[in-house]
Every structure is written in structure tokens, then in C-alpha cells.
Curated annotation (Swiss-Prot):
Stored InterPro entries: LpxK, P-loop_NTPase
Species name: Paraburkholderia xenovorans (strain LB400)
Single GO MF annotation: tetraacyldisaccharide 4'-kinase activity
Primary gene name: lpxK
GO process terms (BP): lipid A biosynthetic process; lipopolysaccharide core region biosynthetic process
Name used for this protein in its record: Tetraacyldisaccharide 4'-kinase
Amino acid sequence: MSEISNRLEARLAREWQQRGPLAWALTPFACVFGAIAAARRAAFSFGWLKSVRVGVPVVVVGNVTVGGTGKTPTVIALVEALRVAGFNPGVVSRGYGARVTTPTQITPASAASVGGDEPLLISRRTGAPVWVCPDRVAAAQALCAAHREVDVIVSDDGLQHYRLQRDVELVVFDHRLGGNGFLLPAGPLREPLSRRRDATLINDPYARTLPAWPNTFALQLAPGDAWHLDNPALRRPLAQFSGDRVLAAAGIGAPERFFATLRAAGLTPATRALPDHYAFERNPFTDVDADTILITEKDAVKLGSWHDARIWVVPVEAALDHRLIALVVEKVRGRSPA
């Protein structure tokens, strides 16, 4: 079933990169989607629907396209940058696939099934307070009440969650940018490319030039040394796997980006794309004839109680442009209480 789902997703992703017959056939539905989205934005803008400002500045890191673009590494890097600037950041998230319906704190010891894989990874990587809830306002209010030291909140995704007032909006794109430029379902866009934002980050290592949008910055993602799943203290540079029979597996929004990263490091892995947010309740690699299995950090936090000594985890670090950090810090300081 997952193989069929992967094929359908791949087909749709290809269609969204061009203005073919299927895309044009779906444009009436895209017009309806766009009208509903615009009406909702207007309702919040004019105060017909109430938005809520929490007691600290809010920075939203999101996207206007469907699929993974590199938001989670960006959130992790931004939390660290805000710390360096003297802030005490916290993080809120919806928690994709989470079981929780009320504000819940995610700690490094939490299960991915409780709050989702991305919040758990952020908690483990940053040590910052992380709260999840389908209602991001409730999550932010609970975070502020429980952690009085927090003086800025980073929202992992939630660009379209207008009920939570925000002070900075960062939009992340990968190499696909806006695809064919059509709204869902004719294209990959949740909102028009012209949507207002404070800055744009482009996650494309092969881009020679950036779009001529205001405050647009390159987002650099680089893999670190792999660590062994059973013994995280055991680390190896990716180049050391070049003589192994390697399988690269990823259950993320853009698995091909992970595979390309490994190829750029000199590896020639077999690949297996799993559905985004794949649960890993059982070992999906029992049929794999490989010396080494490389997975993402986001997938590693979801692995159950089963054991496979071949698995190594590849972390990814995001490098933020210093000008972007300065822009965010300036806006946050401008909103912070004196």
C-alpha cells in the first residue's frame, strides 16, 4: 500500500512542476481553494475572526508549498541563533500525527507517537521547551505559563494558522520553489507566491542565483558525521561508508534530497523512499541485503523497540545567513517588553 502511495505522490509532484493537462483540469478547484483561503485571511485581517497575541514575540517558520522544504533544521538553527543573541526561546508545533488534543510538553524522553517526530527531534537537538497542540495559541499560552523564562517563541510551521499573531514570518522553499505556480490541487501552493513575509529562505545547494524577492537568503544544509543508532557516541564520517553496501531510507517530505546529500558525499546507495512521517512500528529492512542502512534524524526518533545493528543516523545542520539572523533579532527586540 505504501508503494502505491509513494508512486501517486511522485506522480503528483511531477505534475505540480509543470502546467500540463491535469494541472489545467484542476484549476477550477484551485480557484475555489484560493477563494476560501483568501476569505479566511481577510476575516483575520479585518478582525471578523479573532487572532491572539501571546505575551512574547512569535517567529513563524513555515512554507507556502506542500511537502518538506527544510523547516525543521531551520527551526533548530534559529533556536540556537536566538540563544546566542541572548534570548530564551521556546517552540510550539501542531505535532503532525500527534495523539494529543490539549497542550502537551514534549521532552527528549517523549515518544514520537505522542507529539510527532519533528517536535521530538527539536526537543532533543535544542533542549528548548517544546509544546504541541492542534491549537497553536493554546500551545503558546501553556508554554509561556510553564516557562516564565521564555521570551520568544518559534513556531514550527503554522504559517496559515492565523489565529496565532506573529511578529516575524519566515518562508522556506527548496529547489522546486513554487512549482507550476498554481494553488492546490492544481499545483503545490497553499497560498500565492506573492504572499507577504518578512524573509524567504531557499534550500537549494545548486542554485547559482536566488529569486529577486525582498529579504531572500540561501539556506545551507550540510550532513554531519553519522552516529550509530545503538551507540550514539560512536560516529563515522560519511566517506567511511563508501566501501559498504549501503541502503539509504527516508520517511520525510522530500526523501530525494536526503539521497542526493549522500551521493554528494561520495556514496552510491540503494534507496528506499517511505511515506512522510512513516511510523517505523516494525523493522521495514528485514528484506534488505546491505551492510549499512543510513536514515535521517527525523526518522530515528520514531524507531520502535526493534533492533537492527546496521542502522546509522545522519544528522543535518542548517547554516543561517548572518543577515537573516540580524533581521529576526531586530524584529524580536522591537517587540520585546523593555
